[in-house]
From Swiss-Prot:
<feature type="binding site">
    <location>
        <begin position="245"/>
        <end position="251"/>
    </location>
    <ligand>
        <name>GTP</name>
    </ligand>
</feature>
<feature type="binding site">
    <location>
        <position position="250"/>
    </location>
    <ligand>
        <name>K(+)</name>
    </ligand>
</feature>
<dbReference type="InterPro" id="IPR027417">
    <property type="entry name" value="P-loop_NTPase"/>
</dbReference>
<protein>
    <recommendedName>
        <fullName>tRNA modification GTPase MnmE</fullName>
        <ecNumber>3.6.-.-</ecNumber>
    </recommendedName>
</protein>
<feature type="binding site">
    <location>
        <begin position="335"/>
        <end position="338"/>
    </location>
    <ligand>
        <name>GTP</name>
    </ligand>
</feature>
<dbReference type="InterPro" id="IPR027266">
    <property type="entry name" value="TrmE/GcvT_dom1"/>
</dbReference>
<dbReference type="Pfam" id="PF10396">
    <property type="entry name" value="TrmE_N"/>
</dbReference>
<dbReference type="GO" id="GO:0030488">
    <property type="term" value="P:tRNA methylation"/>
</dbReference>
<keyword id="KW-0342">GTP-binding</keyword>
<dbReference type="InterPro" id="IPR006073">
    <property type="entry name" value="GTP-bd"/>
</dbReference>
<dbReference type="InterPro" id="IPR018948">
    <property type="entry name" value="GTP-bd_TrmE_N"/>
</dbReference>
<dbReference type="Pfam" id="PF12631">
    <property type="entry name" value="MnmE_helical"/>
</dbReference>
<keyword id="KW-0378">Hydrolase</keyword>
<feature type="domain" description="TrmE-type G">
    <location>
        <begin position="216"/>
        <end position="377"/>
    </location>
</feature>
<feature type="binding site">
    <location>
        <position position="245"/>
    </location>
    <ligand>
        <name>K(+)</name>
    </ligand>
</feature>
<feature type="binding site">
    <location>
        <position position="251"/>
    </location>
    <ligand>
        <name>Mg(2+)</name>
    </ligand>
</feature>
<feature type="binding site">
    <location>
        <position position="230"/>
    </location>
    <ligand>
        <name>Mg(2+)</name>
    </ligand>
</feature>
Length: 454
């Protein structure tokens, strides 16, 4: 793919630093080098040179490296200027470069987009760059790196190859209608289809783990005032993140903590106690609490174990349960076991899991951690995983649907054309993951979320 514009941007993070890098990509990279550093550096060699304005005034000095396309990150000619990391110096240099006719400032993610368009990496690898930059844990970074190195892509390519081979076999049989009945009962087709379905299920399970690693889980702690919600937040966070007093209604706004459980990102949200209140500020806090509940992956329904022996939230607070979004997972937390005499532990033999604990003494907190991991299906012991996004899971689910539909058609001995079409659709959805078949709108959405200079 030929890009008419040459683009430039700061590749290092904004702000002050020891080193700042300007990246230029496009057919005018050589021209930029001649105008700014006075020569075209030897390919892939670091050259220590002055950086000058178009008028010849020295702005900085540093290292210039030239990469000739297609042997560069973007597949185009690329120039990198590595100078001092002061924002003023970098801004002056970038302004001079953008004055050159045919050169403009890059849009967010445009370098990675060009790398994708020029077949230097596929879409999962491009997305992995952003995921690696945004990783919030060591395990998330490792998973993103695996995707960047093509681990996810290899799984998808293997699946696509097997689907293509089966399509060829099916469509060849369709061309010989006299043999089609024998083909439909051929054990090879059924066996190959079962093998593809099994492999797709394995990849989907791994992708779900990767999605959890990237997205994390939103957990809202909700309940009446003074039930110990903030104490639970502090115990899970391992620090005094929220003010705790004996006064009901101490928490009036939403408090957020971002923690990790064995590498799984967890967004814990403490909310104002839910009750009817004449206080305007508290009312606003309660409205925000419900906003968070409506966006949650799970709610920890906190209750004071000294107030009731019930564990069924529908009996304890039917109005609260009736207002929850349909399908939202709920765990009942019976707090203050140190005062109520409850045995610290977990009971999963009821409609809603019940955990008895003492948030104040941090007794039973590990039960909550393990429970949240189990709720989302996270396996912290998984090694060699890759990062995945919601769109990847959607594509895998669509592919699985069409494979299952094709299998049903085969078992009912319907005409092979229908099976062939289901296999074609399966291949299409799998190709969307790596970008072999992707709409321009989706590409724009993906790359616009990247950093400028990436």
């Amino acid at each position: 793919m030929i890009n008419q514009d040459t683009i430039a941007a700061q590749a290092t993070a904004p702000g002050r630093g020891g080193v700042g890098i300007i990246r230029v990509s496009g057919s005018l990279a050589k021209s930029v080098a001649e105008k700014v550093v006075g020569k075209i550096p030897k390919v892939r060699y670091a050259d220590y040179v002055p950086f000058k304005s178009l008028a010849g005034e020295q702005l900085d000095q540093g290292i210039a490296i030239y990469f000739a396309g297609p042997n560069s990150f973007t597949g185009e000619d690329v120039l990198e200027l590595q100078g001092h990391g002061g924002p003023v110096v970098l801004d002056m240099l970038l302004k001079e470069i953008s004055k050159i006719e045919g050169v403009r400032l890059a849009k967010p993610g445009e370098f990675s987009e060009r790398a994708f368009m020029n077949d230097k990496l596929d879409l999962t690898q491009a997305e992995a760059i952003a995921d690696l930059i945004n990783a919030t844990s060591e395990q998330a970074a490792k998973s993103a790196l695996q995707s960047l190195q093509g681990e996810f892509s290899k799984h998808i390519e293997t699946l696509v190859e097997k689907v293509i081979h089966l399509r060829m076999y099916v469509e060849a049989a369709i061309d010989f209608p006299d043999e089609e009945i024998d083909f439909l009962s051929d054990g090879k087709v059924s066996g190959d289809l079962d093998a593809i379905i099994a492999q797709l299920n394995t990849v989907t399970d791994q992708a779900k783990q990767g999605s959890i690693m990237r997205e994390g889980m939103r957990v809202v702690i909700a309940g009446r005032p003074n039930a110990g919600k903030s104490s639970l937040l502090n115990a899970l966070a391992g620090r005094e993140a929220a003010i705790v007093t004996e006064i009901a209604g101490t928490t009036r706004d939403v408090l957020r903590e971002h923690i990790h459980i064995d590498g799984m990102p967890l967004h814990i949200i403490d909310t104002a106690g839910l009750r009817e209140s004449p206080d305007l500020v508290e009312q606003i806090g309660i409205e925000r609490a419900w906003d968070e509940i409506n966006q949650a992956d799970r709610v920890l329904f906190m209750l004071d174990g000294t107030d009731t022996i019930d564990t069924d939230p529908h009996k304890i607070w039917p109005e609260f349960m009736a207002k929850l979004p349909v399908g939202l997972g709920v765990t009942v937390i019976r707090n203050k076991a140190d005062l109520s005499g409850d045995v610290v532990g977990m009971d999963q033999n009821q409609q809603y899991p019940v955990i008895s604990l003492s948030a104040k003494n941090a007794d039973g907190i590990e039960l909550v951690r393990e429970h949240l991991k189990a709720c989302i299906g996270f396996d912290g012991a998984t090694e060699g995983g890759f990062m995945a996004r919601r769109r990847h899971l959607d594509a895998l689910e669509h592919a699985a649907y069409h494979l299952d539909t094709g299998k049903a058609q085969l078992e009912m001995h319907i005409a092979g054309e229908i099976l062939a079409e289901e296999l074609r659709l399966t291949q299409q959805y799998l190709n969307e993951i790596t970008g072999e078949f992707t709409s321009d709108d989706l590409l724009g959405k993906i790359f616009s979320s990247f950093c400028i200079g990436k």
